[in-house]
């Protein structure tokens, strides 16, 4: 069902949450992290209505819709590249790619019980050089609403010089000469105490937020500003999710580096606001099955948006099984607990080490729906290694252990990947993990 709201609710859209303003939308849109599919990682600019409807139908036929995946998102390259309509100033859908327009595709997607997303950028052009929305926020938001759009991914390309920030924020991606989470090559840092909410980047994204909340349709707002301008200070009051890094690629070094960066941002995760480590690469490139598992498990545990980016009509059963893991999806979509899993021990490194090659290896998170605590153990090394979860080290288990005093107890443990009951496990659980694999457990009631 499509959710609408009147202009009178726009003034009330910012609501106090977690001690800061969060973008709260009608119908609980954006309260939980988004689940869906996007064209970019699979097809880049090679898109059309047929490919998008194929994906939408596969989301239904493969059972992904029943698991909560609902957004079918069109990324860059959907419009006429030469410019806007001269009389209306509206962006024009490419008639060769979309003969029935975007609204025609939206109608078909809605008929499947799914939602549709679109893409633009907070600049003059998109990353692929198509018309973007800076200076046209109101007309574009109105156009998207009229087409039946439910989700906007808003990129950070095509920014003119008069909208460039005064200072440069440190995003410690590999390749930026980052050192332990710092950027020593940054020659234009902001002074101490600088409020990044006053930056031009923040203003560009606020303008589209304000345009979206002024239309009579609820559109989820996904910021894609690549972690710039200290977005963690203002992202939650501006959008429903915000990118924390540069783009992902289907390679383990990049996935590990993003997981490492995002692991330090878990205090920003709760209902209505989600740091976004970028779309999923499950099923793409030359990732091993273990790496696909680790990628998905970490993204789900961090309660990141889970946006599939592979061709669903040719997906393997192994990759589909990863994307369909009911236990991880239940944790991700918990209606009572908004907080994510968090690292409780780094494992390979001393705790709180910033290491793009070796992110935190031990994670845990409370759940209201799993009957226990989610525990992950990652092998970030390049060879098979043994990993051990010690119950007394897991924060969510300490209260139970403390109440038992010196009595030696165990916990009922379930393997998340197989669903197998591993029995009553006392003190600790050990497992041999191949390179870049992850063990995922639900540690349940005491026994």
UniProtKB/Swiss-Prot annotation:
Residues 1-25 form the signal peptide. Glycans are attached at residues 162, 180, 236, 286. It is an enzyme of class 3 (hydrolase). GO terms for biological process: carbohydrate metabolic process. It catalyses: Hydrolysis of terminal, non-reducing alpha-D-galactose residues in alpha-D-galactosides, including galactose oligosaccharides, galactomannans and galactolipids. It is found in: Secreted. The active site is at 155 (nucleophile), 247 (proton donor). One of its GO terms (molecular function) is alpha-galactosidase activity. Disulfide bonds join 45-77, 127-157. Its EC number is 3.2.1.22. Pfam families: Melibiase_2 (PF16499), Melibiase_C (PF17801). Substrate binds at residues 225-229. GO terms for cellular component: extracellular region. Its main location: secreted. CDD domains: GH27 (cd14792). PROSITE patterns: ALPHA_GALACTOSIDASE (PS00512). Keywords: Disulfide bond, Glycoprotein, Glycosidase, Hydrolase, Secreted, Signal. PANTHER family: ALPHA-GALACTOSIDASE B-RELATED, ALPHA-GALACTOSIDASE/ALPHA-N-ACETYLGALACTOSAMINIDASE. Belongs to the glycosyl hydrolase 27 family. Hydrolyzes a variety of simple alpha-D-galactoside as well as more complex molecules such as oligosaccharides and polysaccharides. This is Probable alpha-galactosidase B. It comes from Aspergillus fumigatus (strain ATCC MYA-4609 / CBS 101355 / FGSC A1100 / Af293) (Neosartorya fumigata). The lineage of its organism: Eukaryota, Fungi, Dikarya, Ascomycota, Pezizomycotina. The gene is aglB.
């Amino acid at each position: 069902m499509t959710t609408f709201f009147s202009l009178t609710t726009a003034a009330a859209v910012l609501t106090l949450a977690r001690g800061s303003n969060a973008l709260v939308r009608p119908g609980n849109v954006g309260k939980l992290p988004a689940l869906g599919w996007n064209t970019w990682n699979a097809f880049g600019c090679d898109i059309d209505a047929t490919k998008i409807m194929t994906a939408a139908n596969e989301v239904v036929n493969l059972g992904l819709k029943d698991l909560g995946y609902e957004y079918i998102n069109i990324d860059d390259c959907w419009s006429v590249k030469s410019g806007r309509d001269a009389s209306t100033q509206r962006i024009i859908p490419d008639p060769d790619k979309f003969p029935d327009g975007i609204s025609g595709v939206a109608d078909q997607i809605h008929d499947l019980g799914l939602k549709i997303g679109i893409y633009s950028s907070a600049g003059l052009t998109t990353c692929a050089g198509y018309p973007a929305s800076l200076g046209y926020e109101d007309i574009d938001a109105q156009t998207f609403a009229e087409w039946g759009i439910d989700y906007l991914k808003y990129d950070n390309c095509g920014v003119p010089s008069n909208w460039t920030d005064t200072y440069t924020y440190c995003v410690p991606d590999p390749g930026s000469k980052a050192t332990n989470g710092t950027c020593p090559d940054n020659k234009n840092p902001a002074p101490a105490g600088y409020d990044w909410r006053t930056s031009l980047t923040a203003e560009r994204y606020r303008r589209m937020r304000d345009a979206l909340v002024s239309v009579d349709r609820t559109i989820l707002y996904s910021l894609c500003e690549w972690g710039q301008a200290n977005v963690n200070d203002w992202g939650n009051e501006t959008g429903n999710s915000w990118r924390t890094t540069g783009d992902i690629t289907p390679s383990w070094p990049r996935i590990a580096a993003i997981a490492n960066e995002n692991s330090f941002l878990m205090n920003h995760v709760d209902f209505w606001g989600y740091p976004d480590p970028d779309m999923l690469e499950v099923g793409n490139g030359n990732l091993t099955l273990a790496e696909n598992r680790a990628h998905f498990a970490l993204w789900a545990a961090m309660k990141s948006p889970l946006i599939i980016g592979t061709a669903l009509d040719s997906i393997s059963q192994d990759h589909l099984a990863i994307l369909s893991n009911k236990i991880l999806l239940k944790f991700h979509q918990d209606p009572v607990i908004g907080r994510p899993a968090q690292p409780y021990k780094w494992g390979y490194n001393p705790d709180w080490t910033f290491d793009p090659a070796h992110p935190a290896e031990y994670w845990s998170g409370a759940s209201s729906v799993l009957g226990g605590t989610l525990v992950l153990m990652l092998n970030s090394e390049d060879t098979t290694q043994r990993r051990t979860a010690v119950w007394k080290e897991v924060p969510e288990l300490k209260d139970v252990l403390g109440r038992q005093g010196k009595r030696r107890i165990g916990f009922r443990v379930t393997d998340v990947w197989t669903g197998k009951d591993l029995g009553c496990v006392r003190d600790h659980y050990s497992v041999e993990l191949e390179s870049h694999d992850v063990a995922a457990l639900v540690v349940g009631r005491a026994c």
